[in-house]
Amino acid sequence: MRTLDKRIAPNVKLAASLVARAPTLTLAYDARCKSRLAATLDTGEDVAVLLPRGTILRDGDVLVADDGALVRIAAAPETVLRVRAADPLTLMRAAYHLGNRHTPVEIGDGYLKLEADPVLADMLRRLGTQVEETLAPFQPEAGAYGGGHKHGHDATFAEDYALAQQVFGEHHGHAHSHSHSHDHDHDHDHDHQHGPGCAHGHGHDHH
């Protein structure tokens, strides 16, 4: 069994004819988020995918097998929610609430697209959007926080929301209490002051 263990950087331009001759590995979004999996090429050949942890494959990516051959990644059609609204403000509000939940979202011209989730579908309808379940490839925006993706009903939602609020507070100078002592060393050489604009990188407990 061949192993696909390298991804060619997106900024590396390959000859179109070379990519066109490469066999295709068609994967849904969940599978493209896995750095290690057994998969089957569209030719029927079984392969192993072994990539650095945290790798998320996108439609059009090119992988290199351990024998030097190329394999092209394609996004498989899957069940998704296509979200539209009568006005841009309503769609922006929907995007804001999805972002608060760290939900992977594909942003298109006049629509949002996300994985099918009944909890999120209900929330989006309550916000005044039109939600349509359809079958289509899913290509969400790259995440700002990293890590796995979350659904509206995940038990970790409260933790994610707290993290988002913490990051927001640190980068916008919001005052907050500190429950830990500040006797640790800092690797910068300027005075360390805890004023309203404090935005240092260690975690804070919020009360």
UniProtKB/Swiss-Prot annotation:
GO biological process: protein folding; protein-containing complex assembly; urea metabolic process
Key word Cytoplasm present: yes
Biased composition range(s): Basic and acidic residues: 180-194
CDD domains noted in UniProt: UreE
Gene Ontology annotations for the cellular component aspect, listed alphabetically: cytoplasm
SUPFAM superfamilies the record matches: Urease metallochaperone UreE, C-terminal domain, Urease metallochaperone UreE, N-terminal domain
Localization of this protein: Cytoplasm
Residue ranges, annotated region (Disordered): 171-207
Keyword entries, A-Z: Chaperone, Cytoplasm, Nickel, Nickel insertion
Keyword Chaperone recorded: yes
Entries under InterPro entries matching the protein: UreE, UreE_C_dom, UreE_N, UreE_N_sf
One protein family per Pfam: UreE_N
GO molecular function: nickel cation binding; unfolded protein binding
SMART domains given in the database record: UreE_N
Role this protein plays: Involved in urease metallocenter assembly. Binds nickel. Probably functions as a nickel donor during metallocenter assembly.
Similarity comment: Belongs to the UreE family.
Annotated protein name in UniProt: Urease accessory protein UreE
Organism: Burkholderia lata (strain ATCC 17760 / DSM 23089 / LMG 22485 / NCIMB 9086 / R18194 / 383)
